Amino acid sequence: MGDRRTVKTRSAIKEAFLRLLERKSINNITVAEISELADIGRGTFYLHYRDIYDLYENIENEVFGQLGSFYDASFPSENHPVSLLAYIEQSTEYIYENKKIFALLINRANNTLTLQKLKELFKSKIVHIISIMSEGKVSEYDTVVTAFVISGVVGVLEEWIGTGMVKTPKQISEILHKVLLKLDF
């Protein structure tokens, strides 16, 4: 993957795909269209991805991996003080900087599983925080609160992205942080 040509080709494929995704649903995009727009052969596409859905999943994994790395940086160890605001701020800033990708990813016409994957990412992170705070004991109450929080956070982010991100990342972060601090974990 370190080969510059490989990186450049993958980038061209992703950009072409995202441009097409702005105009069409994922089900109506062909490898031939991506290849033509990226100025590559179809065979080159298949050297990098199995199909269009593999490409889509690769993009999802890339952006969700970045969100996960922000969490790891905000909560480096179990003995480290919890830094929820830092995580929220980094995440909303990243989403804002990549608004085109996120707007396309959360579009239900493209794939409803994206929101579910985002919920799963946040669930794993919130359960980790609760586990640290409760010395490894996650109660049934914690599980219900986690589901509630995740749906709320993802819903707020979906609304924020879907309405053109009128509020700044800092404003959204502060709102989410304030709401989360009011909950009894």
Model-predicted regions and their roles:
Residues 109-134, 143-147:
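Amphipathic alpha-helical packing segments from all-alpha helical-bundle domains
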Residues 1-24, 37:
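Basic, helix-initiating cap at the start of DNA-binding domains
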